[in-house]
Swiss-Prot record:
The keyword Iron-sulfur does not apply. Its main location: mitochondrion. Coiled coil: none annotated. The gene is ppr2. It comes from Schizosaccharomyces pombe (strain 972 / ATCC 24843). This is Pentatricopeptide repeat-containing protein 2, mitochondrial.
Length: 432
């Protein structure tokens, strides 16, 4: 105390005690207020969490309700399709259509597809077309499978239609093609449609379908469809001389696009596309164009042989190709088409000396067809004898090819020689 008295005056000591008391009271008050604030914040957080959880529960319940409704609609659609299928199996078409036209929220696309298949299988393509239009009117969106069913059905109807009345089928196919390529964004399904359409256009001989499908073929870079279209253009060029230049231009444009894209991507061009294009060039009125086609084929096959001198015409060559005997058969078919006997002898001689490809039965048959066209009966006989010694062994088809030459009066005397050779080789052949 003495120290306090000496150091602090009485007044200062009292002030110090008062200040300490106030600070303690302030600290107590502050801690209480902070605690209350924390409780309030915690309470608000709990309320927010509860509201958020309630919202999540409501969303989950809403999602479950929607899922339940959609699953019910989907189940109703499957049940409807199952009932329609069983009725169609019992040939109860009217009852199946009655189920389709009943009011319900079920998706009926699958059921419609079943009835479409039924109509097309029966050959009722007019009824199928009417049902397809009715399907769209009733807000039942056609699926990719719907278009596939229609296109394949029309294609099969063309094969079965012996009268050749394709006007309606052509009209239906063109309209379905436009819808399929417009509404389907799936590359895989589009590719499937393109292949069906290319097959359909080949049978219908429809240039409208060709012009519609070529942009899609370029987009997918599908060799199969490209080959089909080039085959169709080949037929058009052969039987429609007045449109030959236009057709050749269209085919060349498609060929250039395919080859340039393959060069960019470093992929091989399919052999069927090359053979189809060479056959198309062989229909040209210009000898130079026909010669260029054969030069392309020999270069692609890797043969160091140039049949004709290079002309001013330039076509892009594919980077590489895995060639088979199909290319050889195509070359012989082109030679037969342009009717050049000297070319056949030169080509065959070089071909035998190259030893790069297998001379199978199909190749020999194509050579024999060339010889029959040129009327070389003695050479046909010698070729068959070489086949019997070196292979491939002659078949009944081999002798039928050469016996067609004997139907001409000039070569009737060779009939006995061919039949005797067939008998010697134990090949069953009857004189026709």
């Amino acid at each position: 105390m003495q120290f306090i008295k000496r150091t602090f005056p009485r007044r200062a000591f009292v002030d110090l005690l008062l200040n300490r008391f106030c600070l303690r009271e302030f600290a107590t008050t502050y801690s209480v207020s902070v605690s209350n604030a924390r409780k309030l914040v915690r309470k608000r957080l709990l309320i927010a969490d509860a509201l958020k959880f309630k919202e999540q529960v409501n969303n989950l319940n809403e999602f479950r309700n929607k899922k339940t409704k959609s699953s019910l609609i989907r189940n109703d659609g499957f049940k409807l399709a199952k009932n329609v299928s069983s009725l169609l199996q019992k040939e109860s078409l009217e009852k199946a259509l009655h189920l389709l036209y009943e009011r319900s929220n079920a998706k009926k696309t699958v059921a419609y597809n079943l009835v479409l298949q039924y109509h097309l299988a029966k050959g009722h393509y007019n009824a199928a077309w009417s049902l397809y239009n009715d399907m769209k009117k009733r807000q039942q969106k056609p699926s990719d499978h719907t278009y596939s069913i229609l296109l394949k059905g029309f294609c099969d109807a063309i094969e079965k239609n012996k009268q050749g009345n394709f006007s309606k089928l052509r009209e239906y196919s063109e309209k379905v093609t436009a819808s399929a390529l417009k509404e389907s964004n799936n590359v895989t399904s589009n590719l499937h449609h393109i292949r069906i359409i290319s097959k359909c256009s080949l049978k219908l001989k429809s240039m409208v379908l060709v012009s519609m499908i070529i942009p899609s073929i370029k987009q997918t870079l599908d060799f199969y469809s490209g080959s089909q279209i080039l085959r169709l253009l080949n037929d058009f060029s052969m039987f429609n001389p007045e449109q030959r230049e236009e057709v050749l231009k269209m085919g060349t444009n498609l060929w250039n696009y395919f080859v340039l894209e393959c060069q960019k991507k470093g992929i091989a061009v399919d052999e069927s596309l090359i053979c189809s294009f060479v056959k198309l060039l062989a229909t040209s009125n210009s000898p130079q164009v026909r010669n260029v086609g054969l030069n392309i084929l020999t270069k692609v096959m890797g043969l160091e042989y140039q049949i004709f001198e290079d002309s001013n015409l330039r076509y892009p060559l594919p980077p590489y190709c895995d060639c088979t005997s199909r290319s050889l058969v195509t070359a012989l078919q082109v030679i037969r088409q342009i009717q050049n006997g000297d070319l056949l002898a030169r080509y065959w001689k070089y071909f035998e000396e190259s030893h790069k490809f297998d001379l199978n039965l199909q190749v020999y048959h194509e050579k024999l067809r060339n010889l029959v066209q040129q009327g070389q009966a003695a050479e046909c006989l010698n070729t068959i004898k070489r086949m019997s010694h070196n292979g491939p062994f002659p078949t009944q088809q081999t002798f039928l090819i050469v016996l067609s030459l004997c139907k001409r009066p000039k070569f009737y005397s060779y009939t006995k020689s061919f039949l005797d050779l067939a008998k010697k080789l134990n090949v069953p052949v009857e004189a026709t």
